Regions:
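C-terminal-biased regions
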Residues: 1-103
Length: 103
């Protein structure tokens, strides 16, 4: 896991949160959530995992959580996630990254 690229990826997600409409909502199978609050919550969980040395799990969970509510990312942000994983990307995560890429 590359710490520098992980931090850059998290920064991009923080930027996405700041650029989001404060009234925007996201949905998953359990309900509807304010987009800004949702992103802040998953970022908080991510930071906590990173703090405890669980960087890989933190990035995997962050990707899964934002994908579950249909948030897509630009190719530069996806590239940062790939670089954070280094040469150790599972087929599942690779598929997730492809699904999350803005078309």
């Amino acid at each position: 896991m590359n710490q520098e690229f992980l931090e850059q990826f998290i920064f991009k997600i923080e930027k996405l949160k700041k650029m989001s409409d404060r009234n925007a909502v996201v949905n998953d199978e359990f309900g509807e959530y304010n987009k800004v609050a949702y992103i802040e919550n998953v970022l908080s969980e991510t930071r906590e995992l990173v703090k405890h040395g669980e960087k890989r799990i933190a990035l995997e969970d962050l990707l899964e959580n934002i994908n579950e509510v249909g948030i897509t990312l630009d190719t530069d942000t996806i590239t940062l996630a790939r670089k954070a994983f280094g040469d150790n990307i599972s087929p599942y995560i690779e598929g997730l990254l492809k699904a999350m890429t803005c078309k």
